[in-house]
Structure formats: structure tokens, C-alpha cells
From Swiss-Prot:
Protein name per Swiss-Prot or TrEMBL: AP2-like ethylene-responsive transcription factor AIL7
Locations listed in the record: Nucleus
Family label: Belongs to the AP2/ERF transcription factor family. AP2 subfamily.
Keywords from the UniProt entry: Activator, DNA-binding, Ethylene signaling pathway, Nucleus, Repeat, Transcription, Transcription regulation
InterPro entries: AP2/ERF_dom (IPR001471), AP2/ERF_dom_sf (IPR036955), DNA-bd_dom_sf (IPR016177)
Residue ranges, compositional bias (Basic and acidic residues): 209-220
Location of the DNA-binding region in this protein: 231-297, 333-391
GO BP term (any one): maintenance of shoot apical meristem identity
Pfam families assigned: AP2
Complex and partners: Interacts with HDG2, and possibly with HDG3, HDG7, ANL2, ATML1 and PDF2.
């Protein structure tokens, strides 16, 4: 039986041959069947001359290797186990030809030039460049020393119990099957110690994949570049809401600090794509006439062409926006008006005014009141160019612009009441003037006591009660005392409050 397996690799000085015995297995292993261990023979490296002499002296003095450096005799030593255990034990009756096939270049004085330039691998484990020497059965002569520095690798892998893998990659044409050892500390991929064919292949694969990905990205950019979100002119699809918006570029004006002449005119948002396209057509016909490029035939807008002749550009654009569903989403025909989902009342709000947020204007009983509140807030924040639900002449623009915040439902109601109270105040002042003209304007000395009204004029600011009313009797003599006035001469103002 062969000795038990260990995790060490055996490096011997004998040729790599196996016993041709069928009844005994020399490569019994506890590893996986797919990974077959191999013996490595004659693994040496070149060193400098100073290091060679020191290594030779140390090896000559050592008790383990003293038998190999016998200068008086050229006897070739027999097989030794440097690590205390081996995979294969060779028979002692090997021929001298086999024993001397690989050891002759190192122990024969005729080949001392090679022996002086070569030392064992275990003398220095930090040798950076690993060199291999042919271990075939042919004689190693001086003519083959020039090829010692070349590295020939065979396609084998030696696995140990650890995660390190030893890679032997390359092609070998010699009969001896020369191997070169390389150690990889990673657990996934073996290290290849060849001329870089595998690394080159991986680099080629990486470059190919990079080129493919870059080509795909370029194709995507080319495909998405210049794509329109709608088949109609002047219509775009909103990326978040999925609704369609219509815009018109007005190149008849230039804003301050703007490089390109013109401005974008918003025509409203629409639930259907064709409605947005028709809104663009109408705006284009209003701006540029019948020469404008439209989405649909101009003959289909005969009725709208008659209506737009009586309106200015701003008025017509405002009417287009009112017909859109950009704000109401079908809940109300008025802009900025929606129905409360719990109360059922109409609420108004305006967007993008308070730090790019919506401003809530309150709830109202009718749609018209909510629409008026929105109009007042729009005029306050956006001036005369604001898009309102009703005509501008319905509101006092100067009063709205000078009003203070907040602009909400209560402020809109107060403003509406203020406008309504202006006319009743003027009529009440005229009524007071008429009452003063009815009073007598004669002097008190010439005044007839009977002509003095028996009452106190009513003033709305002061309330009078019954005890404040009295009859006026002049201070005269008893002979001239007259009878009290009749009931018809006593006056009371009808605007009393009790």
C-alpha cells in the first residue's frame, strides 16, 4: 500500500515515471476525481554567481544533501524524499540509464558549467523568475543550455487542499513533458504563467463587450434624439400626467436677457391629442393667417375664423385656454375651480404663486363665485396678462393690484362687497341733501312757532328712543298761549329703530 496522502507536493531528482503495475494505484487521492495531481520533477531557477557559491557551500555542509555533492566520485544518488513523504515510491532496481538521464547534467564534471549555474528551488523561495529544465530521457549536453532560460508550459493543473491553484498553461513539444509551476492565491481563477494568451483573450473579450455596449448606447441616443412625443405639430405629451399640452412660438417679440427671439405661448392642456392639435391650429391661424402650417385642413375652421376676427390675439388665446381642461380636469368649466370631494362645494385654487406651490382660495356655494376668486388671484399675481374665466372689464384691476395679501375667498368676497357698496352710499348722500332742502331756512326771530316741526331729525349714526322726542312750546305770556298743535303737525321720521 502507498503511504497516506498529504497536502504537500513532492519534488524529487529522479525522472518523472510511474510504475507500470496494474495491481497497485500510485495516484490514490481523496480529492475530486476531476482534478488529477501530477508530480513535478527538476524545478530549478537561475541565480547570480555569488548566491550560487553560498548556496552550494550551505548545501555541501548540510547533512541532508551532503551525499549529493561528492566531487571525488560521480556516483549518482538514489531517490530521496525531501519533504518526508511522497506520492510514488520507485523501485530500487532502476537502470543506470534512467537514473542518469536527468541527473547527469548536474553531477557529471563534463557538464559542470550547467551545474554551477543552477541551484535547487528550495535554497531560496523568493526567487522571482522561475526557470524550467528538461527532464526527458535524452542526454543533456552543452548545446541545449541556451534553451534553459525559455519557459515551456504544459496544460495541467495541480490542486492542493487549500484554495490556491497551480496553473500549467501552454504548449510543450518536448518528449519529457516539462512543467512550470505558478501559484495563485485567489479561490476562483487559476494563475496562468504562460506567454499571456489567456490574459490577452480576456482583454479582447472585455474590449469587445465594451464596444458592444458603447454601440448600443449610441444607437439608443440616436433613436431617442429628435423624437417627438406627438404626431401633431405644436403638441407635446406630459411625461408625468400623460396629458397633452399645446404650445405656440411667438417670434414677434423679444424678452430681456433672452438670446432667441420670441416666447412660448401656452395654449392649455387637453385630455385628447387631437383637441390639442386643433388648439394649435387655431392659434397659428390667428397669429400668421391662412399661410400657417396646420395639422388639419383650414377649411374645417371656417366658423372659428369668423369668431377670431372680432378678438385680439390675447383675447383669443385666453378663450382657447378657457376651453382647455388644463386645470379643471372636467370637474368644472371654469379655470382653477374644482368640487370638494366631501362637502360638495366648489373650491378655488391657483398654482405656482407661493414659492412654486398651490394657493388655496377657499370654498364657495357656486362655480361662478369660485371662478371670480380665481380671477382676482390671477390678476393679483400675474397682472393684466393673467388668464381669467371672465372678461377683464368685470373687475377693478387697479384695486385688485393694490390690495394686500392674502388673496383668497374672504378677500374676494370683501372686494366684491366693497364694489357693491359704492353705489348705495352715493344714493344715500343725495337723499340727505333732499331732506335738508325741505327744512325751512328762515331766521329764528321771524320764525313762526307753528311752522317748526315737532321732531328731531334722524341721523343713522345715533339711535334715538321715545323719551328723546318732545313737543316744542315757545316761552310766551299766558295770554298768548295757544292750544297745542293737532296730531297732523307732529312729525316722526320713518327710519326709527325700536
Amino acid at each position: 500500500m502507498a503511504p497516506p496522502m498529504t497536502n504537500c507536493l513532492t519534488f524529487s531528482l529522479s525522472p518523472m515515471e510511474m510504475l507500470k503495475s496494474t495491481d497497485q494505484s500510485h495516484f490514490s487521492s481523496s480529492y475530486d476525481d476531476s482534478s488529477t495531481p501530477y508530480l513535478i520533477d527538476n524545478f530549478y531557477a537561475f541565480k547570480e554567481e555569488a548566491e550560487i557559491e553560498a548556496a552550494a557551500a550551505s548545501m555541501a555542509d548540510s547533512t541532508t544533501l551532503s551525499t549529493f555533492f561528492d566531487h571525488s566520485q560521480t556516483q549518482i544518488p538514489k531517490l530521496e524524499d525531501f519533504l518526508g513523504d511522497s506520492f510514488v515510491r520507485y523501485s530500487d532496481n532502476q537502470t543506470e540509464t534512467q537514473d542518469s538521464s536527468s541527473l547527469t547534467p548536474f553531477y557529471d564534471p563534463r557538464h559542470r558549467t550547467v551545474a554551477e549555474g543552477v541551484t535547487g528551488f528550495f535554497s531560496d523561495h523568493h526567487q522571482p523568475d522561475f526557470k524550467t529544465i528538461n527532464s526527458g530521457p535524452e542526454i543533456f549536453d552543452d548545446s541545449t543550455t541556451s534553451n534553459i532560460g525559455g519557459t515551456h508550459l504544459s496544460s495541467h493543473v495541480v490542486e492542493s487542499s487549500t484554495t490556491a491553484k497551480l496553473g500549467f498553461n501552454g504548449d510543450c513539444t518536448t518528449t519529457g513533458g516539462v512543467l512550470s509551476l505558478g501559484v495563485n492565491n485567489t479561490s476562483d481563477q487559476p494563475l496562468s504563467c504562460n506567454n499571456g494568451e489567456r490574459g490577452g483573450n480576456s482583454n479582447k473579450k472585455k474590449t469587445v463587450s465594451k464596444k458592444e455596449t458603447s454601440d448600443d448606447s449610441k444607437k439608443k441616443i440616436v433613436e431617442t434624439l429628435g423624437q417627438r412625443t406627438s404626431i401633431y405639430r405644436g403638441v407635446t405629451r406630459h411625461r408625468w400626467t400623460g396629458r397633452y399640452e399645446a404650445h405656440l412660438w411667438d417670434n414677434s417679440c423679444r424678452r430681456e436677457g433672452q438670446a432667441r427671439k420670441g416666447r412660448q405661448v401656452y395654449l392649455g392642456g387637453y385630455d385628447k391629442e387631437d383637441r390639442a392639435a386643433r388648439a394649435y391650429d387655431l392659434a397659428a391661424l390667428k397669429y400668421w393667417g391662412s399661410t400657417a402650417t396646420t395639422n388639419f385642413p383650414v377649411s374645417s375652421y371656417s366658423k372659428e375664423l369668423e369668431e377670431m376676427n372680432h378678438m385680439t390675439k390675447q383675447e383669443f388665446i385666453a378663450s382657447l385656454r378657457r376651453k382647455s381642461s388644463g386645470f379643471s380636469r372636467g370637474a368644472s368649466i371654469y379655470r382653477g375651480v374644482t368640487r370638494h370631494h366631501q362637502q360638495g362645494r366648489w373650491q378655488a385654487r391657483i398654482g405656482r404663486v407661493a414659492g412654486n406651490k398651490d394657493l388655496y382660495l377657499g370654498t364657495f356655494a357656486t362655480e361662478e363665485e369660485a371662478a371670480e376668486a380665481y380671477d382676482i388671484a390671477a390678476i393679483k399675481f400675474r397682472g393684466i396678462n393673467a388668464v381669467t374665466n371672465f372678461e377683464m372689464n368685470r373687475y377693478d384691476i387697479e384695486a385688485v393690484m393694490n390690495s394686500s395679501l392674502p388673496v383668497g375667498g374672504a378677500a374676494a368676497k370683501r372686494h366684491k362687497l366693497k364694489l357693491a357698496l359704492e353705489s348705495p352710499s352715493s344714493s344715500s348722500s343725495d337723499h340727505n341733501l333732499q331732506q335738508q332742502q325741505l327744512l325751512p331756512s328762515s331766521s329764528p326771530s321771524d320764525q313762526n312757532p307753528n311752522s317748526i316741526p315737532c321732531g328731531i331729525p334722524f341721523e343713522p349714526s345715533v339711535l334715538y328712543y321715545h323719551q328723546n322726542f318732545f313737543q316744542h312750546y315757545p316761552l310766551v305770556s299766558d295770554s298768548t298761549i295757544q292750544a297745542p298743535m293737532n296730531q297732523a303737525e307732529f312729525f316722526l321720521w320713518p327710519n326709527q329703530s325700536y
